[in-house]
């Protein structure tokens, strides 16, 4: 998916180097010099320039349909946000959200905008190849996006207060046909909107437009002068947009014929970053979106919430009076005096005595190899107007007054005087000392002769010239140097900073690239989750450095295990023989299929975010496939047998019992289960000298026999549910009185003991019967709330035969997959956290579809689950599995490999019973290997059962 950016001309050449992105995926240009094209003409220019570079001999139409593209308009003079005019508003650094995990310390408006646009384009129908958006907004969507209809033009809008809509475009739809655009308005008055509301609904245009290839070609045609290749001014919104709809405001035969769909952005939020004031107000709004202290990791309380400092060194204390403050890429020395309503950008390291009046901003721009341009301005300055007009202000006062206070006349100025943006008034100096003196004179000390003399002898630049000539590499280098110091400070002050909620994978790359020492080990009294993050960050830094990282990584997993074990460390067990000498306890369980939300149950993600999973318990070929038999034996030892593996082991000592970490051992699970039941010293309420002594006190030895009538690596939660079945049978045998919830919680701990990791959904999925939505809150005590769902879609004759389960004969062990994904969870990887958040929301959609009894929607959502699993782990769908799917996918509504994927079983939702017959025939005749076969699945209405002989 290619990104096309329209940028300030000075940024175009250095963008790829500064942002460290490749040129193939990112195309940049600027509007032609001296031409105003509007957003429509600018879109045409951007597409034409990209086509000229990448067409490779194809026609424009062929090139257009070749791939999807995101166009971002981020050029312009940025008169109302001068502090970020040289580097473009789209690259404005944005502070990490105090309530969000997985963000980057170096994030900017572009990196925050892009994920939503990419998500929209991934959902767009095949004929929609072009998305157009603005570069000075940040748009969030808190809910899953709806499906995107087939149309020539698709626009997103927001339900907003009418007063806000008066500043933007508005989509009006007849109340009788809300899905159709009736017409569009540009910046309507409140009176117009009030009149309109009687018959119409209106959405505010948020500037996200998707165009079909036909719509693009018409837009480009309208952007050119008639019978000419020369572009003219044509606005996407006020020209093209007003010609759209059933009753368009502009008559245009071709544009009028385009079909239009208007979509409300689900859970949409709109933050504008177009002006200096909005820079602060929008950042404040997004930071204050969440007040729930449980979601805010750090313990820092700012003197004033409207106070943002990043990539900076501040040597003065900040207080509540310093409201509406933005300091970025700057050094504020100990002799500075600041007030409120400031934006301070680009200030190099200094030792100035500088007083900044309230409402005044300071911008320093590197020019050439050594020069600095001093640009003070007012927070409300708009950088337009004739210099003699009293409404034209600099530093918040009329420009003429600013001049007269400093004993300057208009003859001291060079260049135009009809537009403040074009007047050369800002001096360039070559030393930090001179920079401080001239700023004092320009800001608050107009009588400072030394400062005036520097101004008079300096070369001067206009705002336009500053943007055109700024040395952006120096600007970025200074920012990076400040950020190096910030990384160190954030790590040291982790309790009061956002450090351990950042994307630590990104942090590790920065630490290595910048040559920073890795953070020190956290003390034992630090928060457990912070210690886990700390260890995994250290491991990632060592790995990137090519050093041995495994001890640090293992320490992170050990801390996670310890945190989960803490939950039962004070609930030690005293097992008592609770059967007759000739009795056998028989436990059996179904397996589970995860329909949506799998992975969100896995620690540590579930511990800091909670999880949502929809799954169902199933029996195979008419029986629960996991069975455990426990009976007393005369000798005081433990006998372990596996029917399916044909193995046996006798355990006589505590050491032998606690040797359960060996992956692949047939008896790891029963050893760990018996340990948890109180037969190991760590979990026993009574101390014994030996296992034999304990068993004598118990009254018998123990014989445990396992039967797993299902292949390993099946993806049906076999190991977890087998563990629960063993725990459940031992619980009954030993009179421990655990309920099903306790059994499942101890299974989670058992898996940590085995070092295989894993979440809670497998055991709850099998132990609890039927179809259910399982949900947990954040915290180490993961005890899901269970909501049982109707089983109509799985048991009704119309649908029962449409659920197919096919054993592929391909196996894959989940441990390696788990370790990789869990490591990413430890590191707050933004890619993984975003996917997991989508999965969590997706589980609620699945829950809704099952409750509504919508079979088609259910099948579609199963398919979406599969797409999410593939995005999370590329190894989920190996070629051998894809080959099987290719044979039958046209007959399904959805399909997935349960569990971690990569092999095991393939679950399919056939479109109808006839399609199910066809699928059975195809796969029976084209079996990929001798082990592949269909297995009959039925919904389990009992879950885990235990009985006695």
From Swiss-Prot:
Reaction equation(s) it catalyzes: L-fucose + ATP = beta-L-fucose 1-phosphate + ADP + H(+); beta-L-fucose 1-phosphate + GTP + H(+) = GDP-beta-L-fucose + diphosphate
Keywords: ATP-binding, Kinase, Magnesium, Manganese, Multifunctional enzyme, Nucleotide-binding, Nucleotidyltransferase, Transferase
InterPro entries xrefs: GDP_fucose_pyrophosphorylase (IPR012887), GHMP_Kinase-Related (IPR052203), GHMP_kinase_C_dom (IPR013750), GHMP_kinase_C_sf (IPR036554), GHMP_kinase_N_dom (IPR006204), HddA/FKP (IPR001174), Ribosomal_Su5_D2-typ_SF (IPR020568)
Protein name in the entry: L-fucokinase/L-fucose-1-P guanylyltransferase
Effect in UniProt of substituting residue 601 to A: Almost complete loss of fucokinase activity
Cofactor binding description: The L-fucokinase activity absolutely requires divalent cations such as Mn(2+) and Mg(2+).
Listed result of changing residue 901 to A: Almost complete loss of fucokinase activity
Effect of residue 723 to R: Loss of fucokinase activity
Physiological role: Bifunctional enzyme involved in the salvage pathway of GDP-fucose synthesis. Catalyzes two successive reactions, the ATP-dependent phosphorylation of L-fucose to L-fucose 1-phosphate, and its guanylylation to GDP-L-fucose. GDP-fucose is an important fucose donor in the process of fucosylated oligosaccharides formation.
Region annotation (L-fucokinase) ranges: 559-949
Outcome reported for the amino acid change (mutating residue 899 to A): Almost complete loss of fucokinase activity
Native species: Bacteroides fragilis
Effect of residue 758 to A: Almost complete loss of fucokinase activity
Effect in UniProt of substituting residue 762 to A: Almost complete loss of fucokinase activity
Effect upon mutating residue 76 to A: Almost complete loss of fucose-1-phosphate guanylyltransferase activity
Consequence of changing residue 713 to A: Loss of fucokinase activity
